Amino acid sequence: MIQLENIEKHYESKKRRVIGVDQVSLDIKKGEIYGIVGYSGAGKSTLLRCMNVLERPTKGRVFVDGIDLLELNNKQLRKARQSIGMIFQGFYLVSSKTVVENVSFALKAAGVGKLERNKRALELLNLVGIEDKANQYPSQLSGGQKQRVSIARALANNPKVLLCDEATSALDPSTTKSILKLLKKINEQIGITIVIITHEMEVVKEICDRCAVMQNGKVIENGKTYDIFSDPNEKLTKDFIHTVLDFQLPEALLKQCNGTLLKLQFRGDIAAESVVSDMLQQHKVKGNILHGKVEYIKDKPLGVFIMEVSGDPSEISSAISYLEERIKQVEVIQHVSY
């Protein structure tokens, strides 16, 4: 649905050139929810704005639904943008207009008649769950309700793509979850492709099928969300994931441990209890699981357990080798010499 080919965006000044996006290529599939995560200044919002040419790339090509947007004239580009909805952190609602008028405004700009505008706007407010707020003004709404109006407005012209620029960063955790749930519902009901820009890995974990990690204008890692979480390659990616999957043991508990500490990661359908039980039966070691947690990413389990193992060093070494064969990801956190 969206193909970016070697996108670069430069900002020139008298003193220096700033590179906002640096040779980024992405292929975002039709109907998926794609996340782009990075810290402030990573270039993710600039990249998102290149997707609908609100920012014109310095180099590269942008295809949306097979159309090269950079080859269009201004009139053609305005027409093409009707198939690309966009929501922002700041909502940008017209304070002097009611909720239904804010949604209708996008339809009016597209030349839709008044009766049809009103009907469509009410349908969209029903879709996003605030049909009862139709005649209220933005000042009477909560932050989550305002974002729902923004989503309804962005969907007014039946777009094929919805771009979300930090759409939940101004919301509290509970409201964020409700907005993400709404976006997922919309994706499932109408099959719209959604691209989400965020600095929160929790957002990516919650709804994204695939994701990319940006740093200094570059995409440093990308792939299926589950694979990124279960086997990250880059340090920045690992740092982001630790904000969601924090399995660190308290220092006081670490000091009480006399054996070798292992961090075991279980993916998919591998049963942690079975693997650990088999290991203890086949090796002359004692084991004690100190901490464990299972997260579900796109309905697939990802488990991490901290285990203390004690016994003869050679048996411990053999037990670790056995675990590595069964579950692949085994990390020795603390090794005790006997």
UniProtKB/Swiss-Prot annotation:
Keyword Cell membrane: yes
Broad class of enzyme this protein falls into: translocase
Single GO MF descriptor: ATP binding
EC number: 7.4.2.11
Swiss-Prot/TrEMBL catalytic activity: L-methionine(out) + ATP + H2O = L-methionine(in) + ADP + phosphate + H(+); D-methionine(out) + ATP + H2O = D-methionine(in) + ADP + phosphate + H(+)
Highest taxon above the source species: Bacteria
Domain ABC transporter: 2-241
UniProt keyword list: Amino-acid transport, ATP-binding, Cell membrane, Membrane, Nucleotide-binding, Translocase, Transport
Annotated residues for binding of ATP: G38, Y39, S40, G41, A42, G43, K44, S45
Database matches in InterPro entries: AAA+_ATPase (IPR003593), ABC_transporter-like_ATP-bd (IPR003439), ABC_transporter-like_CS (IPR017871), ACT-like_dom_sf (IPR045865), MetN_ABC (IPR041701), MetN_ABC_transporter-like (IPR050086), NIL_domain (IPR018449), P-loop_NTPase (IPR027417)
SMART domains reported for this sequence: AAA, NIL
Protein location: Cell membrane
UniProt keyword annotation of Membrane present: yes
GO CC, one annotated term: plasma membrane
Topology within the bilayer: Peripheral membrane protein
Function: Part of the ABC transporter complex MetNIQ involved in methionine import. Responsible for energy coupling to the transport system.
Known partners and oligomeric status: The complex is composed of two ATP-binding proteins (MetN), two transmembrane proteins (MetI) and a solute-binding protein (MetQ).
Protein family: Belongs to the ABC transporter superfamily. Methionine importer (TC 3.A.1.24) family.
Record-given protein name: Methionine import ATP-binding protein MetN 1
Gene from which the chain derives: metN1
